Amino acid sequence: MAPRIAVVGAGTMGAGFVRLFADAGYRIRVFDVRPRAAAAAAEQREGAVAAASLTEALAGADLCIEAIVEELEPKQALFRELANVAPAGCVLATNTSALSVAAIASAVPEAVRPRVLGTHFFNPPDIIPAVEVVRGPETGDEAVETALGLLRRAGKVAAVLTDSPGFVANRIQLAMVAEAWRCLEDGVATAESIDAIVSGSFGFRLFAYGPFAIGDFNGLDVYEAVLRSLASAYGERFSPPRALLEKVGRGELGVKTGKGAFDYTPEEVVELIRRRDEIFERLAEIKKTL
């Protein structure tokens, strides 16, 4: 039997969830306090149904994903309602970008809190692969495994995180955004130039690799030296992190030493570099068409 998904909130993200899970063959019920919005979201895919109430939306659901306004009090109020109507075993997920999962879960009875977690998708959620599965302090293993299974079966790249401000993506992304604005304020470059440099340099690499893999290619000792130089100019926000200093102190500098953030055999290094260059050449050709 196909999994049942309840989507609460039929805005941009909720409508994307309908497309995502319907395309995976799941049964979808979507509810919104605006009936027309729920109907419009459901009409995107055959088999999706606009529910007339929360009770109807959650009937038999394996997973409920909330996608309402990004404010704590409305989310807490909704989760109190969800806790009253959700079937036993239904995982209650909040699609928050930065709010505390623990704070949202605090609104429901203690017996329900093990079923509450975060699922931070990225817009458009039916296209962008990653989902941050955020485990609150009271989230149970079963809820995490259920969410991971349903998300991965739908083709998502789902990773488990602890409940921390900004999670991973926004903590890193917004640090970059803030620094880009500082470059603009300081007169270093125009907005157009900054975007061109980012999208054509480390942004280009980030399509295929995360910051740790890129760091291992570039050399962690190089990162340390550059960070020290930047810290002398811009202050403590660029100070090398302790974990990076410890790696460099042990001579674990990345691909060139066979160990950095990750471990590498000599054979793996050869294949990694070959594969990296192949990917970048293909990306460069695609970028020319944009």
Regions inferred by a protein language model and the residue ranges of each:
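C-terminal regulatory/interaction module of P-loop NTP-utilizing enzymes
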Residues: 182-190
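Rossmann-like NAD(P)-binding element
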Residues: 33-36, 47-92, 99
